[in-house]
UniProtKB/Swiss-Prot annotation:
Signal peptide: 1-21
Job of this protein: Part of the Tol-Pal system, which plays a role in outer membrane invagination during cell division and is important for maintaining outer membrane integrity.
Pfam families in alphabetical order: PD40, TolB_N
Record's subcellular location: Periplasm
The protein, known as: Tol-Pal system protein TolB
Database matches in InterPro entries: 6-blade_b-propeller_TolB-like, PD40, Tol-Pal_TolB, TolB_N
Location, primary (coarse class): periplasm
Keyword Cell inner membrane on entry: no
């Protein structure tokens, strides 16, 4: 049985507020086609009520992934089991699920709990039929760790990460965060830069302002956010440490200071500046504030983002007459147009594996999130929502969070990169925009 250390939980726990969901996730499409899985309620081996039901977090995570569909816990053939040893393969015959998650929670010390879980291969059990079976061969994973009461939800995300990776081969992204801007004009300082767990829980306010805030972008180590603030009645770019709250003004040139994007090594920002007349792409060394001009054209160049190797930028440019996406090689300055389908293509980013372009496509006047395979150049429109903008890709490349409009309000939404799973993330109060998905934490 493996021991999961607490280090992966400390980053999240440091920012946690009382547990609540600031953004309610409303799944709109894709659950029925997902892969069935059994998440058995974890057994509480203490007295009094269970402090928190981790299995609920796991089931919700797997549902929101768009890949799995947890079965109704009340209809499972076994309940009250916590280990593979208690698993009875014959009772699961005919259950349409590929795996089962079982576990237990028991007191370990003052404000400490031991959490154990096993991931069981149901497909192998069913394929064996009545043949002799070594139950140990069904064990896909088994782990335990000691957590505090404040870490229940985060450890549930960690279990989900393990389950997701074991069954798909792709690293889970449940122990990640999102940054976004909330706007509520009923308040004196209506603009708030917020951080929350990927599912909207544990919301934390980083900054509040009477003037607009926009374009948050994570550093690759997950410790800092770059963003644009108009707090001094003009656009300026700041970098802020999300733990210490210390922040540095990186760019305050005349005109546009916008669209910051961290380089893969975290040392440089790619930005949009108009200090020399036109809207152009620059890089800024964060430590020295040294700028380097990357583009030089009379047309608008904006919205830079980095290719994973750090050697090129993806930009939106109107040099062809309409907004399209281009690749700019930093050493040579070579410019390559990437998009041709539709009327406009803008606001792009590259998936972490460097293979896929995620962007906003306008066709017939409709703005939707789209993807394009960089090798085959095949493009697929992923969404059917309205006025989509600001797509941000999960660090495992499987999901995209973006801004859209629903019933006249700006909300966040999510779509899987295959377009099959869709969800909305409306806020309880105000409007939400400019999402940015964190790296792995």
């Amino acid at each position: 049985m493996k021991i999961i250390g607490k280090w992966a939980l400390l980053i999240i726990a440091a920012l946690s507020l009382p547990v609540k969901a600031a953004l309610d996730i409303v799944i709109t499409e894709g659950v029925d086609a997902a892969r069935p899985i059994a998440v058995v309620p974890f057994v509480w081996q203490g007295t009094g009520p269970v402090p928190s039901q981790i299995s609920d977090v796991v089931a919700s995570d797997l549902t929101r992934s768009g890949t799995f569909k947890p079965l109704d816990a009340l209809g499972l053939p076994q309940s009250g089991i916590s280990t593979l040893a208690e698993f009875a393969p014959q009772k699961w015959t005919g259950i349409n699920a590929e795996a089962a998650v079982v576990g237990a929670i028991k007191p370990y010390g003052p404000d400490q709990y031991l959490v154990t879980f096993d991931l069981i291969d149901l497909l192998k059990a069913q394929l064996a039929g009545q043949a002799p079976l070594n139950k140990q061969d069904l064990l896909l994973d088994s782990r335990q760790t000691v957590i505090t009461a404040a870490q229940f939800r985060q450890y549930g995300h960690r279990i989900s990460d393990v389950v997701y990776e074991k069954l798909t081969g792709i690293r889970g992204a449940f122990l990640t965060r999102i940054a976004y801007v909330v706007v509520n004009h009923a308040e004196k300082a209506p603009y708030r830069l917020m951080i929350a767990d990927y599912d909207g829980y544990n919301e934390h306010m980083l900054l509040r302002s009477p003037e607009p805030l926009m374009s948050p972008a994570w550093s690759p180590d997950g410790r800092r956010l770059a963003y644009v603030s108009f707090e001094n009645r003009k656009a300026e770019i700041f970098v802020q440490d999300i733990f210490t709250q210390a922040r540095t003004k990186v760019s305050s040139f005349p005109g546009i200071n916008g669209a910051p994007s961290f380089s893969p090594d975290g040392k440089t920002l790619a930005v949009t500046l108009s200090k020399d007349g036109q809207s152009e792409i620059y890089t800024i060394d964060i430590a020295t504030k040294t700028t380097r001009r990357i583009t030089n054209h009379y047309a608008i160049d904006t919205e830079p983002s980095w290719f994973p190797d750090g050697k090129s930028l993806l930009i939106t440019s109107e040099r062809g007459g309409r907004p399209q996406l281009y690749k700019v090689e930093l050493d040579s300055g070579k410019l390559t147009r990437l998009t041709f389908d539709g009327e406009w293509n803008l606001g792009g980013s590259i998936t972490p594996d460097g293979r896929t372009l995620i962007f906003v496509n306008r066709t017939n006047g409709k703005f939707n999130i789209a993807r394009m395979d960089l090798e085959t150049r095949f493009m697929q429109v992923l969404t059917t929502t309205r006025l989509d903008e600001s797509p941000s890709v999960a660090p495992n490349g499987t999901m995209v969070i973006y801004g859209t409009t629903h019933q006249g309000r700006q909300v966040l939404a999510a779509v899987s990169t295959d377009g099959r799973f869709k969800a909305r993330l409306p806020a309880g109060q105000g409007e939400v925009k400019s999402p940015s998905w964190s790296p792995f934490l």
